[in-house]
Amino acid sequence: LTAYPLNPTFRSASRKETSGIPYTQEELDSLSQEYYDFTKYLLSNYQDSKKVFSIMPVVTMDRWLSGRDLASDESPGVCTESDSAPKARIDNMIAYISTISNAIHRAAQENSASKSKVYLTCEINSFTCAQNNPAIKQAINSVIPHAGCDLVGLAGYELLYYSSTAHRNDPNFLRQAFNYLASQAPDHPDFPGGKNIVISEVGLREQQGTQSDADWFVNTFLKT
């Protein structure tokens, strides 16, 4: 479920994770209440169904942190420390995600008799710069380790670009990429051994790229 905040109190401030202006406690409280109520509704309404819900409150997190949209920017350029997301944006994103995380987990604890599950999924869309140079701050190494995400989703546009060009003949590239993502995500008791990485968007765009690239990526992706 892609679930953006609906509360008017918070929606008026929803761009602050981009601007870097700190959230007020009132804004965070309204955010917390909304996701607590939503999680409680899911767990109580579907308590006997054994359904699993994945709530994703922000998509392509790196676009919000750095302003770079890798869905259209197929050549991110060189990886330098100037590519790092500003600290103020990182701090705001951690505050935003961790507030939602605490609300979801509090509701889950209070409704532990429910047979359904609700997990917080945090989607990133860029990580190769941080993988190659840890000094570069992206969502995967600056937000994910601290925000309380249950699952880490990957929007794979950047991964598709690199794997089908510079790393086309490297059979280990995708595996190394997934292993890196797992190394940055905190362990989760429901997904032991770093198994809390999910593919939220494969990254194949219609009518762009060649069919052979798409076929190669999908086949390699599934094998990995």
For each of these PLM feature ranges, what is it?
Residues 1, 41-49, 109-113, 139-148, ...:
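Acidic (Asp/Glu)-rich catalytic clusters
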Residues 206-224:
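Substrate-binding clefts and catalytic carboxylate motifs of secreted carbohydrate-active enzymes
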Residues 52-58, 90-136, 190-207:
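Aromatic-lined carbohydrate-recognition surfaces of secreted/lumenal glycan-active proteins
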Residues 1-89, 108, 114-116, 159:
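Substrate-binding cleft and catalytic face of glycoside hydrolase catalytic domains
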Residues 24, 28-32, 86-97, 133, ...:
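Solvent-exposed, acidic/flexible segments
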Residues 32-43, 90-108, 174-186, 218-223:
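Generic structural signal for well-ordered alpha-helices
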Residues 3-7, 61, 124-128, 156-158, ...:
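Short, flexible loop/turn elements at secondary-structure junctions
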Residues 132-210:
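Glycoside hydrolase catalytic-domain groove-lining segments
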